[in-house]
UniProtKB/Swiss-Prot annotation:
A motif (HXXXXD motif) lies at residues 135-140. It is a single-pass type II membrane protein. Residues 1-57 are cytoplasmic. Belongs to the 1-acyl-sn-glycerol-3-phosphate acyltransferase family. It comes from Homo sapiens (Human). Pathway: Lipid metabolism; phospholipid metabolism. This is Lysophosphatidylcholine acyltransferase 1. Its EC number is 2.3.1.23, 2.3.1.51, 2.3.1.25, 2.3.1.67. Optimum pH is 5.5 and 7.5. Erythrocytes. The lineage of its organism: Eukaryota, Metazoa, Chordata, Craniata, Vertebrata. It is found in: Endoplasmic reticulum membrane; Golgi apparatus membrane; Cell membrane; Lipid droplet. It catalyses: a 1-acyl-sn-glycero-3-phosphocholine + an acyl-CoA = a 1,2-diacyl-sn-glycero-3-phosphocholine + CoA; a 1-acyl-sn-glycero-3-phosphate + an acyl-CoA = a 1,2-diacyl-sn-glycero-3-phosphate + CoA; a 1-O-alkyl-sn-glycero-3-phosphocholine + acetyl-CoA = a 1-O-alkyl-2-acetyl-sn-glycero-3-phosphocholine + CoA; a 1-O-(1Z-alkenyl)-sn-glycero-3-phosphocholine + an acyl-CoA = a 1-O-(1Z-alkenyl)-2-acyl-sn-glycero-3-phosphocholine + CoA.
Length: 534
């Protein structure tokens, strides 16, 4: 598989009109990956700061948290559901001022000496909801502490010592995983607050639902837009030359990010409040359209592209299996196109055997775009042509249907590596014994990983102990059982772009601190993906 540049249908954010139904092509970089490379001088600076300023900054930040805790504790006593009094009591204003000052001191101690603010924050009566993007780090809490706005948080967050008390002070909206109706109740609560005519604090929401590397804006979750109330878009920038801020699924862990950031002399952050966006009647009826149009406005302000990658694509990259998807895999793009064509993974998984039998009957015979569309039972379209081009590496106008079936298998069941390999062996294997040669194994694994180049010679020789020049799935399965980490040793031992993004931490926590509450994302059967702590 090969991703040709940014795709034939790439477009800047400004051209993505409200009624534009095309899916924009993805950016050149995977938004869920962040590589941090320090020069020799930067490493020397980190070493010096680690021994000098870092411990001081850490102690001051911790002291500020401890100082804020009793104030927040006293101020948050009572029912959080009770409507705030209007106008706020004098003591509440004093506590607000003190907490903002303490939090600002904490960020100052961390190197955020100046927070540049552009534009004007809307009044609660003008916009009850603030949508922030791009969401790239836990340092995105800076605008929350500066404004003392409410946020949407997991219910479990209230039990975190000190931090949980500070959170409760800002009257957050909690989402409970144990309550099946929690997401619906959350949307109703946001709608209730939005219609309170400014009686409740504004709610800050990160509609991307996860952290990215700020190279683009991924699909916005519709939860913040379901109430149909006006929102104020807020864009965040961290213009430091060395980006120690970004906390993505693949890259430095949370503790490493904290350490490197506190070892910088100065950390820059910019917060820009854009004009309030009032939805049209059509947008009120269609939250996805509302979210898309707000995202377009924010992308234009940031000067970045938009992509229809979603948090679910990140879950695909993080699925636990014996083959780890590389950072530059084409399968994220393939999964996006599958969604765009309206193909449901649940239905595709049931039809995989039928697809594979159809591909096996072709026996490697190449097919054109029309037959490709007929095989997937979808009409020819721009999206299908984009998918077709992923497999048409030579530009001949023909592809091998078997490769598409392998890619579909990975997207439908990303954690079941051996099931995908077994399906591939059925399609590629010789009729008499189901064996494949080195060339076919290379094609299978390249497609399963979504890469254009891959050397499998060492792996093939290790499996083919008898030097028959061919292997069966039984041989492959036996080898995989004996050497579960065969991919790291034989396929990409020295290739840094294959670095795993699915490391397990002893105390895993979600990526980002703003919980998702979109109703359509409530699959209770799927195990939630966790971000590595370090």
């Amino acid at each position: 598989m090969r991703l040709r540049g940014c795709g034939p249908r790439a477009a800047p954010a400004s051209s993505a009109g409200a009624s534009d139904a095309r899916l924009l092509a993805p950016p050149g970089r995977n938004p869920f990956v962040h590589e941090l490379r320090l020069s020799a001088l930067q490493k020397a600076q980190v070493a010096l700061m680690t021994l000098t300023l870092f411990p001081v900054r850490l102690l001051v930040a911790a002291a500020m948290m401890l100082l804020a805790w009793p104030l927040a504790l006293v101020a948050s006593l009572g029912s959080a559901e009770k409507e705030p009094e209007q106008p706020p009591a004098l003591w509440r204003k004093v506590v607000d001022f003190l907490l903002k000052a303490i939090m600002r001191t904490m960020w100052f101690a961390g190197g955020f000496h100046r927070v540049a603010v552009k534009g004007r924050q809307a009044l609660p009566t003008e916009a009850a909801i603030l949508t922030l993007a791009p969401h790239s780090s836990y340092f995105d809490a800076i605008p929350v502490t500066m404004t003392m706005s409410s946020i949407v948080m997991k219910a479990e967050s209230r039990d975190i010592p000190i931090w949980g008390t500070l959170i409760q002070y800002i009257r957050p909206v909690f989402v409970s995983r144990s309550d099946q109706d929690s997401r619906r109740k959350t949307v109703e609560e946001i709608k209730r607050r939005a219609q309170s005519n400014g009686k409740w604090p504004q709610i800050m929401i990160f509609p991307e639902g996860t952290c990215t590397n700020r190279t683009c804006l991924i699909t916005f979750k519709p939860g913040a837009f379901i109430p149909g109330a006006p929102v104020q878009p807020v864009v965040l920038r961290y213009p430091n030359k060395l980006d120690t801020i970004t906390w993505t699924w693949q890259g430095p862990g949370a503790l490493e990010i904290l350490w490197l950031t506190l070892c910088q002399f100065h950390n820059q952050v910019e917060i820009e409040f854009l004009p309030v966006y009032s939805p049209s009647e059509e947008e009120k009826r269609n939250p996805a359209l509302y979210a898309s149009n707000v995202r377009r406005v924010m992308a234009e302000a940031l000067g970045v592209s938009v992509t229809d990658y979603t948090f679910e694509d990140c879950q695909l990259a993080l699925a636990e299996g014996q083959l780890r998807l590389p950072a530059d895999t084409c399968l994220l793009e393939f999964a996006r196109l599958v969604r765009g064509l309206g193909l449901k993974p649940e239905k595709l998984e049931k039809d995989l055997d039928r697809y594979s039998e159809r591909a096996r009957m072709k026996g490697g015979e190449k097919i054109g775009i029309a037959e490709f569309a007929a095989s997937l039972e979808v009409p020819v379209s721009d999206l299908l042509e984009d998918m077709f081009s992923l497999f048409d590496e030579s530009g001949s106008g023909e592809v091998d249907l078997r490769e598409c079936v392998v890619a579909l298998s990975v997207v439908c069941r990303p954690a079941r590596t051996l099931d995908t390999i077994q399906l591939a062996f059925k399609m590629y294997g010789a009729q008499e014994d189901g064996s494949v040669g080195e060339g076919d194994l290379s094609c299978i694994l390249k497609t399963a990983l979504g890469v254009a180049e891959l050397t499998v010679t060492d792996l093939f020789r290790a499996i083919d102990q008898e030097e028959k020049g061919k292997i069966t799935f039984a041989d492959f399965h036996r080898f995989a059982e004996m050497y579960p980490a065969f991919a790291e040793e034989y396929l990409y031992p020295d290739q840094t772009h294959f670095e795993s993004c699915a490391e397990t931490s002893p105390a895993p926590i979600p990526n980002g601190f703003c919980a998702d509450f979109s109703p359509e994302n409530s699959d209770a059967g799927r195990k939630p993906v966790r971000k590595k702590l370090d």
